[in-house]
Amino acid sequence: MKKLRTILFAITCTLVIALTTLLPVTATDDAFDLGKNLYSTNYIFLDADTGQVLSAKKQDEQISIASLTKMMTVLLAIENSSSLNQTVTITNEMIDGLYEEQASVAGYVNGDTATVLDLCYAAAIPSAADAANALAIQIGGSFENFYQMMNDKATQLGMDHTVFKSAHGLDREGQYSTVEDVSKLLRYALQNPTFKEIFSTKEHTTQATTYYPFGIPLVSTIWAYADTYGYDLANLSGGKTGYTLQAGRCIAYWATVNDMNIIAVTAGASTNVEQYSNLSDAQTALTSLASWHKKTILKKNDVVSTIEYKSFMHTANIDVKIDKDITLDLPADVECTYEVDLPKKFSAELYDQNIQATITFTADNKTIYTKTISITLPQEKNIFGRIILHLQNFIKG
């Protein structure tokens, strides 16, 4: 009896981190709405560490994302280059048509040479379309092959509402994404230290080119305009801006506020009121986030539920415990509660039972976070108990 009781109480509960989800909050006038004063029509704000969505609006609407596309281009270049110091020769194919479309360019001309790393900086910092095209042909061998690589990577990352048809993000028919998909891309890409370094750089100078014997000076589209127009983006660590007539002003960035590691993607901001409305939105959101804080809702080994487990000879109460702290980002003075969706009684079976349950966290009368946990209940060990279970199953057919 003592051995069986020991087995029962030794059951462990393991958090299934991959199944973490959050029901996003829509734009209403409440403490969780980070977008109520934004110009952007589409936005998502999430915790980079936990995936908790803090606030979102039209996050799954298919839209143009303009030069945010270049984050995928640079990521693929980093992941698929044998060496970032490899030299690329610029060809007419890489630059044809860009001036006619009034695309942002670094200024490379036919015959110039550049390293893959310099091209990554050029695509990321001043949003150079010529650099993005050069990376596409260098990495993919052709534009079409590279677009396929982009779409394959999007599928891998769960970007289910994204289709790429360019490396630079200029408007193309049938090309679209969502701010939620872009947040998935950025969250993944930030695990790559080279990507993180490039997109957090304010200035970079390339190797010498035909028209720039001392190298092309590259300046970030984020910090250059923030400094010029007085936007306070002190907490912003890095990111990428974008603009086309179809997309409006866009920005994807990461920031640290009150120990919260935030990822934000906003899109569709009009320039009718403010020229750099995407940067204005970043400032507004970061100011709002200053009143948010991390709060530990559950600590490791906290009991979230107790179940009654009945075997042939014994009945035992088993505590379901959390194996790690659960910390959420919350506005000031907002309390969070939780409920566990788990039956209170279980009976032993002929096999181990893997049980999943959902913990739902609620604040300000809305679901803000859900986490799935799993527990394993051992099979019936007693020989007479197993015989009875076999007979019951036989009778049931």
Q: Model segments located where?
A:
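Short, Lys/Arg-rich N-terminal segment immediately upstream of the first membrane anchor
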Residues: 1-4, 56
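Residues at the start of alpha-helices and the adjacent loop-to-helix junctions
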Residues: 2, 16-19, 65, 69, ...
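Sec-dependent N-terminal signal peptides of Gram-positive bacterial secreted proteins and lipoproteins
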Residues: 3-27
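Structural motif marking the loop-to-transmembrane transition
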Residues: 3-4, 65, 112, 116, ...
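Active-site-adjacent loops and short helices of periplasmic peptidoglycan-processing enzymes
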Residues: 25-180, 184-193
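Domain-terminus/edge residues, biased toward the C-terminal soluble/receptor-binding domains
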Residues: 159-160, 174-176, 180-181, 186-397
